[in-house]
């Protein structure tokens, strides 16, 4: 399942990128999550991303994983602001 989501961040986009590229790498692999695209607004307080999870039944487990929660919070993600904007069937990245 591919989806577009958004959430608030408080420590900037580079800090969030480090979270995804380094700190969450093992957890993303464990739960089959891939981030295909991400961008931030001008003041780097909100991220918009397109991600994919291999097994939709693992979404809740990933979001409830205590280490994932801890790492995301430490990286400045406002967990309560997360919103799935839409699922995605087709896409192209140039």
Task: Identify the function of each model-found stretch.
Residues 1-69, 75-94:
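Short S/T/G/P-rich N-terminal loop/turn motif that feeds into the first structured element of a domain
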């Amino acid at each position: 399942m591919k989806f577009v989501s958004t959430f608030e961040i408080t420590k900037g986009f580079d800090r969030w990128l480090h979270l995804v590229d380094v700190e969450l790498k093992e957890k993303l692999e464990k739960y089959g999550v891939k981030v295909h695209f991400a961008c931030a607004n001008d003041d780097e307080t909100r991220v918009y991303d397109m991600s994919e999870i291999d097994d939709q039944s693992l979404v809740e487990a990933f979001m409830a994983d205590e280490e994932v929660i801890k790492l995301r919070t430490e990286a400045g993600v406002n967990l309560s602001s997360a919103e799935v904007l839409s699922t995605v069937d087709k896409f192209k990245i140039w």
